[in-house]
Amino acid sequence: MDYNGIDSSSVKTHVHLNEILNNDKVVNATLIENYILQLKNNRSIIFPDEQPNGSIGSNKFISLFIPTINSLLNGEHYFEIDPERVVISLLDAILAYLNIEEILSLYPLDFIINGLTGDSAICCMIIRLLRNNATSETTVKLFDETAILDTILSRYFEKNTTLNVVSQVELLISELVDLSSTVVSTKLLSTEFRDLYEHARDNEDKLVKFLDYILLLMPYILEKQFDLPKNYYVLSYSEFYENDDVLQVVLFIQFYSKLIQRINTFGNDTNIIHNIKPCLKDLISYFKTRQNDDIVQSFYANDIVDVLFHVSYSKVPELLTFNEEVVGQYELFKSYNLFLHLDCDIKLLSTFNPRALPLEIIEDILQEISIFNQKYFSILLNCIGSENVFNKLIPRLTTSVIGKLSFDMLYSLLLRMSEFEYSRKHLINGMPNIVSDYLANPPNVSESEIWNLKKDTLQNLLFSNTDLNVWHDPISKNFSLMCNGRKVQDILPQVDIADKSLQ
């Protein structure tokens, strides 16, 4: 074997692979894994002399390793001698340095398609290589003209597909969507896969995975105003209310939460919003049964609150209109529809956009609770996000009351106030004792969470447009101290005495 020009680690690894090939020895996983780390960090192991126009077939490293690895993978006992699949990982690390044309010169198309149906490690490797080369015209042509995508999606929707394969498929689809690849419209959203999609949509065991898949495509669908079949994202009444699988119902609710997030981010497709409105209304009706339904209260209510949270912060006109219905028509925030002994109701009031609620409703709620009680404190913090509500709260935010709060509550309050111009101004100009005692000349705090709350508050104040007046320098100094520490020459020397009787 001619190892001239090959580094010593590569020689050692190749010798080991040959020994395995000839004697069916068990693969030394540690040796291979350590070598893979070297390979990933050093391209020159494969390409010691860069030759941009050179053929991959003439590369000595490739000509040594690829045939040996192929022989091992095709061996009758491969999966017994390499239970951790490290040889596949080695091949993956090598091929990661090659473009799709070079890979195809080493492996025929049949190998790629067959590999997608084989061992999960090989399948993941192939999908990863396709994703890494997704911008290549050759890869796009492979997707358009071969059965590669058919094979990938068929495996994805199989009931027992391993999570690592599912993850790699989803990364590939996300990459194609992020690139706005023509493959999305010509293949993934074409009628070609309709039978596959319909089968997955109508299969109880595959439905959750199908909804996850639709979410992956949704940015492209929204931006391109693509007309997606309604039944792909609209769930029927029976799928929610006649479903005994609690976890599945939770995932259905989470689907709508994620769908609204995508609508808020990528576009205001009015057809999709119009079509999901009945589902959202059903969720609200479902939520209103929480007081008398333990399943709804324990498993569904908090996720429905997440849906309402994303609706409340939407800037999409049709969702804004729907939000008005949530507040007005469904009277969700009327005192007789709120149960503040339930965690889900506290979460609702702690997350729902306070600017999307009429002032009189919030005033009624705040009159019903002790805002400085630990249980309801998150509601107070949320309400500060509305200037109108904050102005109503000012008489209750007195120095004496705030000064009695625990440090975690106090600094959580100051951090929240530091996030908005109107509350920053009140903090700086209307609460001098609080600024002096807890921000300009703060007490020493060692607990990490409180320390971070204080630091973030100082940062918000310093990097805002608010005039800090006389507080700028002490706040700036304190922030610098928290970020960089105290200079050695500024530390007063002292000796700790363990026994006070010696003092």
From Swiss-Prot:
One GO location term (cellular component): cytoplasm
Q: Which domain of life is it from?
A: Eukaryota
This protein's record includes keyword Lyase: no
User: What biological process terms from GO does the record include?
Assistant: DNA repair
Q: Which UniProt keywords apply?
A: Chaperone, Cytoplasm, DNA damage, DNA repair
The record's InterPro entries line, in alphabetical order, gives: HSM3_C, HSM3_N
Q: Where in the cell is it found?
A: Cytoplasm
| UniProt main location, coarse | cytoplasm
The protein's matches in Pfam families, at most eight in alphabetical order, are given as: HSM3_C, HSM3_N
Q: Which family does it belong to?
A: Belongs to the proteasome subunit S5B/HSM3 family.
This chain's function reads:
Involved in DNA mismatch repair in slow-growing cells. Acts as a chaperone during the assembly of the 26S proteasome, specifically of the base subcomplex of the 19S regulatory complex (RC).
Q: What is this protein called?
A: DNA mismatch repair protein HSM3
> What is the species listed in this Swiss-Prot or TrEMBL entry?
Debaryomyces hansenii (strain ATCC 36239 / CBS 767 / BCRC 21394 / JCM 1990 / NBRC 0083 / IGC 2968) (Yeast)
